[in-house]
């Protein structure tokens, strides 16, 4: 028997699709429903390695944990990992299949993947009672409707009802709900069952007249109003859509266990990947994690982390341009703690030979670790288990770089010299005993009277956060009505909201016979890079995309119709 399902779409990127999907999964599994998450196509630099060695989006791994099932490649068959302004690495069924430009991806290749993603969805439906799908960006991107495989494309194929999530904290949620619906075709509108308001602050009764008017305009009900929830700490889907400059993560669990706090600075390098590595540190009472992009911000840090990146050579150049490279070398010489993870580990080495990622050839590293890196075309995808500092450690590896360690003390797969550590392993800090031992060493080297809490369990904290998501759905949504959608599909007779989607090819470059722009404004997963305002666009990570007044003027001259203005 095929299981039921639901597509969680959003009015915009960051509307809350990932956490709502996770919350529904946790709510369902607590009701005894065997449920799985699914996202046909994801654009993310935060990824995860499954037990079978497949790379998928980190958000889908988190949703699988919410559903209490083991994540597999079926749950995220297509993953796009941006590596430059106009290209992404395409990961299909957990394995990289090559780099592709945005133009090439839109030129028929994306449509060709529809069969693959629907096959994966059908396999999940044959195994689970319910599959909760997450969309990408907005389903109303009219310029991308023809090639859509992640929003209404997958909903049509599966005949799944669609729940549209809107972030009211941004403002304009009613216009967003109405406009999203009104820009869909009649066929697609017949699947849009209704709406879910996310991140509401205040008295819900003040919102109810607007919800009634929305029903009058669209003929669709609102299935819930989720309150703004602080301190969830759930995995970010990717690091492209937001500048992390100045962002702070710290424990909301308890005050410091010792006399001092421990200050951690994370270099917000370009194309930062798996920055969720620091979440386990931020969960420790007394540890404050800050993302930085200026050399002076390293001065008072007790530990500096150079995180993973999809562009190691680009990150190295960025560190040098910012003066951060010199500051890191100086820290190492002074015996002040530095940790390099994956691409950050590679940066700390002596030399990088890269004919794969950047094709820059041989580039000098910072030289603080006795390591030489050679990029291989085959990607390492692994779930290693080992020990370090006398404690057991588990992690996962996602990298093209092969490390030739030529000295220092062994540290996981990498090495340690003084107070500088380097490893390719992501997720190692989630191993509680190892994390406590590592933080104690950092505190000693930094001269801090910081004591790791003896009972902090990152796994337990994560389960508590997922339960909070399940509680939000159970307490603030019409749970019975949601289950009715999952089992029975969208209500019959939903009215059409004009004007509907324009005919394919109406207006724009396509109807004029010209090639479409290679990087149109679009939701996540459908472009490699473009203008800011939608996930995967702008590539501003940690302040790496700077705009001077002169630069803004040049952009305006090139992209604005000056005569019309």
Residue ranges and their predicted role:
Residues 1-330, 337, 354, 377-378, ...:
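Flexible phosphate-sensing "switch/lid" loops adjacent to ATP/NTP-binding sites
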Residues 342-343:
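Catalytic nucleophile serine of serine hydrolases
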Residues 349-356:
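Extracellular/periplasmic helix-exit of transmembrane alpha-helices
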Residues 356-382:
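Conserved P-loop NTPase catalytic core
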Residues 506, 518-519, 529, 542, ...:
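Short, low-complexity intrinsically disordered segments enriched in A/P/G/S/L with frequent Arg
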Residues 526-529, 534, 539-541:
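Long, intrinsically disordered low-complexity tandem-repeat segments
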Residues 532-535, 545-547, 556:
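Short linear motifs in low-complexity or flexible loops
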């Amino acid at each position: 028997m095929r299981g039921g399902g639901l597509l969680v779409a959003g009015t915009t990127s960051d509307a809350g699709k990932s956490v709502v999907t996770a919350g529904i999964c946790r709510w369902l599994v607590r009701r005894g429903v065997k449920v799985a998450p699914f996202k046909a196509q994801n654009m993310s630099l935060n990824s995860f390695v499954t037990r079978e060695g497949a790379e998928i989006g980190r958000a889908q791994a988190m949703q699988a944990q919410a559903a209490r099932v083991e994540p597999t490649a079926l749950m995220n068959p297509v993953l796009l990992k941006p590596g430059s302004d106009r290209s992404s690495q395409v990961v299909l069924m957990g394995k990289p299949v090559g780099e592709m430009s945005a133009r090439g991806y839109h030129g028929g290749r994306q449509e060709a993947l529809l069969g693959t993603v629907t096959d994966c969805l059908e396999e999940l439906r044959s195994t689970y009672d319910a599959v909760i799908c997450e969309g990408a960006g907005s389903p109303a991107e009219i310029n991308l409707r023809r090639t859509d495989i992640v929003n209404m494309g997958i909903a049509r194929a599966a005949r799944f009802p669609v729940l549209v999530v809107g972030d009211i904290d941004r403002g304009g949620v009613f216009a967003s709900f109405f406009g999203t619906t009104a820009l869909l075709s009649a066929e697609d509108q017949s699947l849009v069952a209704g709406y879910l308001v996310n991140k509401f602050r205040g008295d819900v009764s003040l919102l109810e007249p607007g919800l009634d008017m929305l029903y009058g305009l669209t003929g669709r009900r609102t299935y819930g109003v989720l309150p703004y929830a602080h301190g969830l700490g759930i995995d970010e889907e990717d690091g492209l859509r937001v500048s992390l400059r100045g962002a702070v993560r710290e424990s909301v669990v308890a005050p410091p266990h010792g006399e001092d706090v421990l200050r951690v600075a994370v270099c917000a390098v370009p194309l930062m990947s798996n920055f969720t590595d620091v979440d386990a540190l931020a969960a420790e009472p007394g540890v404050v994690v800050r993302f930085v992009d200026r050399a002076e911000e390293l001065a008072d840090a007790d530990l500096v982390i150079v995180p993973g990146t999809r562009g190691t050579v680009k990150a190295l150049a960025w560190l040098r341009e910012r003066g951060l490279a010199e500051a890191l070398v100086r820290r190492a010489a002074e015996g002040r703690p530095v940790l390099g993870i994956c691409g950050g580990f590679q940066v700390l080495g002596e030399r990088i030979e890269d004919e794969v990622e950047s094709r820059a050839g041989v580039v000098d590293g910072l030289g603080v670790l006795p390591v030489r890196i050679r990029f291989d075309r085959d990607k390492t995808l692994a779930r290693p288990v080992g020990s370090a500092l006398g404690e057991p450690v588990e992690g996962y590896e996602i990298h093209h770089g092969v490390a030739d360690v030529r000295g220092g003390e062994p540290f996981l797969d990498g090495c340690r010299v003084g107070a500088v550590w380097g490893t390719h392993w992501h997720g190692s800090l989630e191993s509680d005993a190892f994390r406590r031992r590592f933080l104690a060493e950092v505190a000693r080297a930094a001269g801090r009277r910081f004591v790791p809490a003896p009972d902090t369990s990152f796994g337990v904290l994560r389960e508590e956060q997922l339960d909070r998501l399940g509680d939000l759905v159970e307490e603030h949504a019409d749970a019975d009505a949601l289950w009715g959608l999952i089992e029975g599909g969208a209500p019959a007779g939903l009215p059409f909201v004009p004007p509907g989607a324009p005919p394919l090819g109406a207006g724009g470059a396509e109807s004029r016979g010209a090639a479409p722009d290679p990087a149109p404004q679009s939701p996540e997963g459908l472009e490699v890079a473009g203008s800011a305002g939608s996930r995967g666009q702008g590539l501003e990570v940690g302040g790496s995309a700077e705009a001077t007044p002169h630069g803004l003027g040049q952009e305006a001259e090139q992209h604005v119709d000056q005569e019309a203005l």
